[in-house]
């Protein structure tokens, strides 16, 4: 396994506390606000023209929840992340034509959101374990692109 028992424990302990809807919505909102050129993938979501519109956009919030719930599946499948994301990778590559760099960016934003919401839990070791996790998820999602 890429994760040792201690890392698995750290990842699981924090994940049980995560409010997936709230943190997921915030993570996707942050990506669209901080990297406005990424909005082109979400033009069918209605008004995403500025920070307030994005934060209050129900489709952005719902998709953010969906994205973070999917990330939560990686937490449950730490030993088979690549296999678990094979179909999503194919979908994002072939149907949505998403730049795989986005997966790394969103992973880093997920780290920021978790650190902001759970500062007592998000110590150095937890940060290292989650950084490893977001890297593996990003690599798994980019797998179909190679």
UniProtKB/Swiss-Prot annotation:
Q: Where does heme b bind?
A: 63, 92
- State the tissue distribution: Red blood cells.
UniProt keyword Repeat, yes or no: no
GO cellular component, alphabetical, reads: blood microparticle; haptoglobin-hemoglobin complex; hemoglobin complex
PROSITE patterns, per database record: GLOBIN (PS01033)
Q: Which UniProt keywords apply?
A: Heme, Iron, Metal-binding, Oxygen transport, Transport
Superkingdom of the source species: Eukaryota
The residues covered by the Globin domain are 2-146
User: Which Gene Ontology BP terms does the record give?
Assistant: hydrogen peroxide catabolic process
- Give any GO molecular function from the UniProt entry: metal ion binding
Q: Which Pfam families has this protein been placed in?
A: Globin
UniProt cross-references to PANTHER family, sorted A to Z: HEMOGLOBIN FAMILY MEMBER (PTHR11442), HEMOGLOBIN SUBUNIT EPSILON (PTHR11442:SF7)
Self-association or partners: how does it assemble?
Heterotetramer of two alpha chains and two beta chains.
Explain the purpose of this protein: Involved in oxygen transport from the lung to the various peripheral tissues. Has antimicrobial activity against B.subtilis ATCC 6633. Has antioxidant activity.
What family name appears in the similarity comment? Belongs to the globin family.
Query: What's this protein's name?
Result: Hemoglobin subunit beta
Organism lineage string: Eukaryota, Metazoa, Chordata, Craniata, Vertebrata
The coding gene here is HBB
């Amino acid at each position: 396994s890429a994760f040792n028992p201690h890392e698995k424990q750290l990842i699981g302990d924090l994940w049980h506390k995560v409010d997936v809807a709230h943190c997921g919505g915030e993570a996707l909102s942050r990506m669209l606000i901080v990297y406005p050129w990424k909005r082109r993938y979400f033009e069918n979501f209605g008004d995403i023209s500025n920070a307030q519109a994005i934060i209050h956009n129900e489709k952005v919030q719902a998709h953010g929840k969906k994205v973070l719930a999917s990330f939560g599946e990686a937490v449950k499948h730490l030993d088979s992340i690549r296999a678990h994301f094979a179909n999503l990778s194919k979908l994002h590559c072939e149907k949505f034509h998403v730049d795989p760099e986005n997966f790394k960016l969103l992973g880093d934003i997920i780290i920021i959101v978790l650190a902001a919401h759970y500062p007592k839990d998000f110590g150095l070791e937890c940060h290292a374990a989650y950084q490893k996790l977001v890297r593996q998820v990003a690599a798994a999602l980019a797998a179909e692109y190679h």
